[in-house]
Amino acid sequence: MSARTHDFYRRNRERLLQFQSGALVQSFEPTDNVKIVILGMGRVGTGAYESLAPTWGREVLGIEAIDLRVEEHKAEQRRVVRADASDPDFWFRVNLEEVELIMLALTNHSENMLVADLLRSMGYRGELAAGVRHEEHVHEMRDKGISAFNLYGQAGAGFAAHAFELMNEKNDPSSSLQ
């Protein structure tokens, strides 16, 4: 979606809402009492959720567009709702003033940027963080005030630390690997 589409919707939202069915409105899942929102509940988003949930509990909300994934997450007792992160109407239902952090874990960099711009245009003033796959995206995100984490750069360091630990265990006579 383009920025013009979002502008059009924002200007005409009240008129358009009168055409929503009652069934649609009732289908909206609760998004209240949220401090952290994770957009995209694939591997990265799920990993972030699992890291944050022990501390933040139900104040963490995952957003996923794929129905099957939403159901899988709910079966695992995760608080995940089905929504399109680029849909302004969804964000109007979220109290952005109580949200402290939104984590962009969508697979498409341009969609992450679009959603970040949308959120800022809607008045979101909390923290934005994103996992990125390319170094040039880190700079682009930071230029827009988004904290960027290079997934592959950090993954390599973690992989090396893990391998080094294995090597140390193998060389340690008291290790169970021998």
Q: Predicted segments — roles?
A:
Residues 1-178:
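Cytosolic regulatory regions of ion transport systems
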